[in-house]
């Protein structure tokens, strides 16, 4: 059967290291030579290399079959051998075309391990062949070759331009693994066994993961709360993946040059005074971490005189982070803070008006000045370690240095806009800076930087004025759109200002877009899943759609029969979470249209309904907002005063979300109830942030843990303040890559790349990273837990996007011709691929760093790259 490009991508995604290992037949094991691979054969050295490595299989008749193609079933067998996956002799894969075959147990093994996927229609195509583009993609993934690329990728072969495998093939060319065939690359040509051997051998010689069979670990010790130290030999051949431990994860391993010791960094802290099994290469070591305080240093900081939730900070030993009093308590240590005035008399600066404290939390309303604070850490029944530092107290409230964020809202009921609390009635926040003539608006919130912290400004400290009262007038903080035109609004707090360019239109707001998140829903028949619907007008602002404003056109498959999208809830106009029920097994798309005769489309939602088949796994603790997104972290960050909801989710044996478990009989525990509180309501566990900090929430039943989440409560609004772009010149030559690397300093990583040149409104040692692939490609975030992956503890900062200018011209078939002039939530340009210049290109590619990728008014900075490769008529 002929393969489509989509099918080719499936092949590429199913095997990440095919033919790197395997079982050598008796004939192959006897020697390197095969009768059909004569001396001097162009692939002889590569075939011999893989024979030596035990990575290829000779045929029963003793031949190699260099001209034969590789099928997917054979690759599944090899992949199983590579990863030493457990093989169940009676196992059958879920793919309907891969059952009861000689290779079924191997296909089942790689499917269970998450290595392979089908075509989305329960097919695996075990006899399907692999083309060169798919094989290139396979090699790039198996050896992480994208990270090895030096410089900009260039498309040297015309038959690669616009092909789905262009980038992967270019990586092989860049690294010298492939040189093409007779001036072409032939991406659609099937790969022969000889070609496969050549590809793999060249790649393996350069980039194979070091063999760690010689590594021998003799001891594992916990040397810090988040650090293990290994001793032995050959440890420089280990990676973090070789170290596993329950309830924690090894995220980095750094070995000494002689390989006799290695330091392993963990993602979380080790529980003190408890035995912990640590596995290294299958061997188990019992580690018991006894926490000892050897050094202590009080941080000399400046505090505000009347701010709540401030505390003295100190560091222990040589640890990077601040000391954790809760962890010290678990480790058997008591902490005591003693404050004195500089003359030695007691200073009652702690909570409760005392001079001594066990938490270090400061009182509200402290006299300005300097104080000596001694911190004493005493091991119960043991010694005390102490240190004294000087802290200073000032009035920092009025010292705003910058306005970081201003939120405007439309006052639809002419009753004023609520400040720093939920909006009332049908008022809505503005995404754009557009008003319609006659509308009234107001400031919903202003956040200013005060002593390097972001605080919501008291409304009495804000002043507002308009540059053009004939277009937009301002009176007592009330904004009114008087007439069509433009005006600049200036917001002032203290001595700092921030300006906003507004336009006033005369076109009445109307519904233009309905976006569903997720826009592809997978649900069990008879069950419901929440979908967030966002409705916006022609200006990109929230639009409250009432019942009847949207015509839901249901698919004939009957997967969904009832849905009424309305977004008029008070406080969240334009956004609503609505449960969608799966009715019949099958798939189909719900289209959202104008109910009037024009019937223009607003958006769509694709729904796949699967049969009910509840599995026997323990339910998973998930955020209600992410119910059904199996694998999403339960950890989250929320602002003080905000609430998040959790549930225990049941899944089918196929991994499809079924429903929420009943929480009757469950209990919860909050690690620090001063940071957050929790309560169970029906099937929901609700957690509310109280004060800034980090704590754990644990759900239990009959004493056993049923779920766990780490909650980070913050009172800050971290955001980008400026972007440093590279200097760029006009691109006048063909085959030049214009992508994110052209304009921004991107440092490659095995996970999410580091993005340099992004300045934030806070001082931090954490890296700013960017997601380089997947649905969230281009997302910029602060990697707070330093694991190079965006999860619940990290802070989303915005996106890097790229579009071409409207006046750009290009020849059909060129990258620039296909590049979008405008992005939508579902149709985006690939900023990492960018465009490769070609004859006929003339125009501009504009790279933007934005808070909201589909809201042009939220940009933090832009850089334009001019392209002029006109050498022939278009």
Curated annotation (Swiss-Prot):
InterPro entries: Cell_Envelope_Struct_Comp, SLH_dom. Residues 31-93, 94-151, 152-214 form the SLH domain. Transmembrane segments: none annotated. Its main location: secreted. Keywords: Cell wall, Repeat, S-layer, Secreted, Signal. GO terms for cellular component: extracellular region; S-layer. It is found in: Secreted, Cell wall, S-layer. Residues 1-30 form the signal peptide. The S-layer is a paracrystalline mono-layered assembly of proteins which coat the surface of bacteria. This is S-layer protein. It comes from Bacillus licheniformis.
